[in-house]
Amino acid sequence: MSKAATKNLVIVESPAKAATIERYLGPDYTVIASYGHVRDLPQKSRRAAKGSVAAKRPKRKKGDPPAPKPAKGLGSLAVDVENGFTPHYEIIEEKEGRLADIRRAAKGAEAVWLATDLDREGEAIAWHLAEALEIPEADRRRVTFSEITKGAILESFSHPRGINLDLVNAQQARRILDRLVGYKLSPLLSRLVAPRSSAGRVQSVALRLVVERERAIRAFIPRHYSTVELGVRPAVDPDLVIPASLVGPKGENLEVEPEVAEAAVARVTGGVAIVTERTESTRKQRPVPPFTTSTLQQEAGRKHGYRSRVTMQLAQKLYEGVDIGGERTGLITYMRTDSPTLSQQAISEAADVIRTRFGAEAVVEGGRQYASKSKNAQEAHEAIRPTSFHRTPEEVASYLDDRELRVYTLIWRRAIASQMPDKLSATTTLFWSVGEDRLKTNATRTLEPGFTAVYLEGKDDEEEDAEAQLPDLPEGSKGEVATAEAVAHQTKPEPRFTEPTLVKELEKHGIGRPSTYAAIIERIQEREYVDRDRENRLRATRLGETVCDLLTTHFTAFVDLGFTAGMEEELDAVAEGRADWREVLGKFWATFEPLVTEKATSIGAGEYRNRPSDEKCSEGHPMEERLGRFGWYLACSLYPEHSERKSLSKVIGDDTPGGDVPTLEGAGLPCPQCGAEHGGKMAQRRSRFGYFLGCDRYPECKFIPKAEVPEEFRLAFEALCPVCGGEHGGKLRPRRNNKRNTYFYSCDRYPECKTIRPRPTGATHAECGATIGKDDEGGICTRCGARVDLPEGELVGLVIAGGTADPLAFAPKRGRRVAADGKAKAEGNKAKVASRARTVKSKGKPKRIPAAAAVAAAELSASDAAGGEDEAT
């Protein structure tokens, strides 16, 4: 700490909000960040964990108290199942330096305030901090707030409470459950299916939903039918053509065979249509509630295509605060909630804004409140809303990037709309007769837009009805059937899940919680159980289907939707003090552990790696589907006597024409390297990165033609490397990422220089003379990280000024285990932090890394602290 002593030490999770809270509380308070959890179940067994606290404990000196003995029989679980499921927590290795800083600061403080997030995860972090700091129970001051505003902060500090152990036990039970399932099932899957296969209590159920939807799509048999769509020209307005449909005697839509539809077209075309019935009806449409975590993820995915993880990262930044007019301000309330309710203060403020912008008639007297539709809505938090409705999207637009503004606009508009009147619409229905045939016309018009003047919810799979205005056509009015057409249709299966619709399905079944949705979906994609089709929808891979088959066959109850939802209800009961967490775990373990033990010996080793198929090899022998290093393939069942093999796509069904297996130009041509001398030819081959051309004499000839960079990724100018260009002349060039099948821009002196930057634009940054690149957020200097505005049109040769240097812009965020600099407690301290460095252990040897990179990586881990399940590989 920079101060020798402080009266009050406040511990929060994220450094981004520390400076804001410290400013609100005044000089008697110092705020420091824990960067998420500081203690957890160890990731390795005690014997293997070289970096664990136990392994690094110093030698005892004379007079030291006896060292605590490690619990026996814990193994890699770190949970004593024989002693009430007592967990063995350890300080997270990369948090030891951070905890030491907090401990030093706490020693000189008169009071320590635990201000971690207000959900179960935050409550558990507060408890772990209190335990690690050895704060007496009577002195544990716990404060929570749902928004980072001065009023909310001061109010929470005026009413501290103790740590809610029911919430802690609910989180602890979930953590142990996930450890038991992950560490017991994952090794079994890795042995029986593929290395690195994993199972999780919730992720496996999410996988089952995706697999079952995929199989339903494959098994679906479409039904073909036709409808008859017509256009009627009324006698009162010959220039107007009113759309109509052929219906049955009761007004039902007719779905008929194509020949029946064609006969109807011939029968009614040119006929006289007479209005036999006219009805008017009105409909009220209520506004949708303010956002919860799941509905925000769904809507951001539908309207902007954001993945759940991206949405949560953007919402986290809006919650923690952005710099507005030189002052960091929290823009939204806490973003992990399943409650759609608003406080009375928020409702009153929303009414003021509505009255000003839309008039007094747009204010709903008394406001609106909403009840959660979630099966197992958790603690009574507020919905996600702006911290101030007076802070409109237009007012904050200049302080946010495009993606942040889109998310803030969604939240502001949805919350405002939730307090506005219903939409009122009128529908006119006309029934016509043409001889013995009956036609129907529907036309809907808006009478009062109500809340839709501000916000209209997106749809997953349907379009909004188009509005139409009909002329005054009383019964008996006549017209001519001007057009008639038989329109062919076919029934369609339910579509593949998108991330938003999968979140919706999980929530509908009561599976998962606000803090876990994004992590669940990320995990099943990381393990390659699920990938994305051309429309960005989730589809199960062969590996995912195989893992799902094993789990549903041998562990049916534990991947059952009802069972998993029931476990969530039991955890909720623990959080509410209605159930004992040890009893919940004991009941689960009593059935789970014997089943895993039995299946470990009864399932055949090759049962899920070799599967029969309907294919025959060139000699007529049956072929088997087998799982190899690079995925699934077909092999002759007589291998090794007959070694014929065929590639299989990652997803079942993509092997058919029109699937994802490409046809590469050049296959069959002579190999440029050995064709003349040895007769080698170019053949289409496959690796774990996809299909490529290579010599068919491999490994004798290893020739692979260099892939040509597609036109859209080429640069028409030279861009110097911002790191080594001046001294060594390195240039940024497009390089292919084989795994993701895309291109990135890196120094052509690799591996001497490993610089990677966004795509160069050809413009130069005036302040530092480096090339300006362009990423998803706009222009960025490739040297100093300053954000700049890019004008429209040609950029090559332009010199653009502006932007503030950002030393964290290109800091590494993955691949290193780092400790955050204990003296960097606020994002506003970036420039000072960038000059320091911490020494961390890497493979047993000291290694210096920039402290800025340490902070960046620690912030990333802090933002991810709330989600995920255990797995052992």
Predicted regions and their residues:
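Intrinsically disordered, low-complexity regulatory segments
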Residues: 1-175, 184, 247-248, 252-255, ...
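Basic, low-complexity terminal or inter-domain segments flanking catalytic cores
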Residues: 2-7, 19-20, 186, 219, ...
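Conserved short loop/turn motifs at secondary-structure junctions
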Residues: 6-7, 117-118, 193-198, 280-289, ...
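Conserved nucleotide-binding/hydrolysis micro-motifs of P-loop NTPases
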Residues: 15-18, 35-40, 118-122, 146-151, ...
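Alpha-helical scaffold elements adjacent to nucleotide-binding pockets in ATP/GTP-utilizing enzyme cores
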Residues: 20-24, 101, 105, 124-132, ...
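C-terminal or mid-to-C-terminal helical accessory/interaction module adjacent to the motor/catalytic core
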Residues: 101, 148-230, 280-284
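Metal- or metallocofactor-binding catalytic centers and their adjacent structured scaffolds
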Residues: 253-290, 477
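Short acidic, hydrophobic short linear motifs in intrinsically disordered regions
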Residues: 275-278, 286-300, 326-335, 493-505
